[in-house]
Amino acid sequence: MSMGRKIIAVDFDGTLCINQDVVNWPYLGQPNKELVEKLKALQDEGHVLILWTCREGELLEQAVAWCRNFCGINFDAVNDNIEATKTFFGGNSRKISCDYYIDDKGCTPDVFYKLLL
């Protein structure tokens, strides 16, 4: 894949970590193997990965360790912009700045409009 270096933000629950249910949250389910393999390949090609999740504190630490130990993914940033982005914009916004957001809850405006019909 030749697309220049991209920054990819990926959600944890329901995206990287699947087979969970609300009743058992914050249970750590199984890895989304296809996504994990694709992300690892992209990182090997030089792309930047950011873990982008609502988890915080100990639950966030568990998720980061799960990704590292169980999936072999070491994120370039966790719930934060990378240093190059902070430098470029002269600060750090609350919104993660990236080229792609991967999230089980997301949708494009076109999909959202169709949901309203």
Question: What are these regions, as identified by a protein language model?
Answer:
Residues 1-117:
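HAD-like aspartate-dependent phosphatase fold
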